[in-house]
């Protein structure tokens, strides 16, 4: 058997009616793990409801409805295969929590597929000041999604159909915008497609014979293989802590960076509690080592369940152990906030698995969110659409890191009433040593060896 294909995560972005669902549905339909029987059922229902426009979006609508109703659908439905990769669509932006998910990063996307609607009016709506094309592209870049594929969709609906002139015009406009955001347009494939008719999705289309570049499938194969951060020091934010009879205390979480293995002495930030890892398990199987992306449970010695909680971060005690933050400086973008944000604002921050109120202690600068240039020092307030550097103070002990060193622990969302009002990236952290940190006997013994 050959080497298993590499897994990559894709996020599909773009304006409301650009055809994201149809395009994603088409890929999953043609290349994915959807059972043919399920497809037939959907097709029959679509015909009964007279949804002639069914094609592929219907597949996705059904999956979404089932997902939102809490029916656990087989996640294989969101996967498809290319020659080189197993691709998972980690989120499609119709989803309510799309922006939060992108930031708190249940999984970090390796590539963004930006879908553009080139029809007259459609394109202008997407790229206008309020259009989501801009916001999504900016978010993707700010959150470290380095690679992008741009699909000029609905080529079957341009005037005239499959218009090269319209495609050229779109490429020019979108390139200049993406350049302002921070992407290098020369490294982006601009693929003219029809998610509905299937042109250039998987096979070359004779309707687009003027286009000589890759199909969408080829472009996905040309993504650079992502480097997984297993060589960095360990960071494992806890999602839960269980007490399991006969075993003891078992913290659970996802390895974000580094590796964890039995026998390692770990320090939990922010409390500084240090102990030895007895065993590491994933899907009820013991592991000799867990890598980034693995969701694991691990058993720790001489530790009570009360000593650990969600939001704590496990780290290697001998390799840059995690500590609490006294304060940190972030670049924040205000998104859906109705009022003004000034010094003293204290919302709840979602950063990795922690959910803690943080005070905006000082607004340091206001910056141009497109270019990053400073516009004003010590602004009185920030409002919708503004970006700025802010010094923040956690109201309770919490672990954060700079985005540059540990990306998953360096980005956050500010949410009020289930609405994301701001997103941020952490630029600097002032750490503090814990007071009275407990070192278990097992850890002390290990350290003395």
Curated annotation (Swiss-Prot):
Residue positions where N6,N6,N6-trimethyllysine is found in the record: 79, 187, 306, 396
Record's Gene3D superfamilies? P-loop containing nucleotide triphosphate hydrolases, Translation factors
InterPro entries (UniProt xref): EFTu-like_2, G_TR_CS, GTP-eEF1A_C, P-loop_NTPase, T_Tr_GTP-bd_dom, TRAFAC_GTPase_members, Transl_B-barrel_sf, Transl_elong_EF1A/Init_IF2_C
Q: What is its main location?
A: cytoplasm
Q: Which cysteines are joined by disulfide bonds?
A: none
Annotated stretches, region: G5? 194-196
The tr-type G domain extends over 5-230
G2: annotated span = 70-74
Q: Region annotation G3: residue ranges?
A: 91-94
Which residues of the sequence carry a binding annotation for GTP? 14-21, 91-95, 153-156
In the record, what terms sit under GO molecular function? GTP binding; GTPase activity; translation elongation factor activity
Q: Positions modified as N6,N6-dimethyllysine?
A: 55
List the residue ranges of the region (G1): 14-21
G4 as annotated region, ranges: 153-156
Give UniProt keywords alphabetically. Cytoplasm, Elongation factor, GTP-binding, Methylation, Nucleotide-binding, Phosphoprotein, Protein biosynthesis
Q: Which domain of life is it from?
A: Eukaryota
- At what positions is N6-methyllysine found? 261
Q: Where are residues bearing 5-glutamyl glycerylphosphorylethanolamine located in the sequence?
A: 289, 362
Write out the GO cellular component annotations: cytoplasm
Family matches, as SUPFAM superfamilies: EF-Tu/eEF-1alpha/eIF2-gamma C-terminal domain, P-loop containing nucleoside triphosphate hydrolases, Translation proteins
Subcellular location field: Cytoplasm
- Sequence similarity: Belongs to the TRAFAC class translation factor GTPase superfamily. Classic translation factor GTPase family. EF-Tu/EF-1A subfamily.
What does this protein do, in the record's words?
This protein promotes the GTP-dependent binding of aminoacyl-tRNA to the A-site of ribosomes during protein biosynthesis.
Question: What name appears for this protein in its UniProt entry?
Answer: Elongation factor 1-alpha
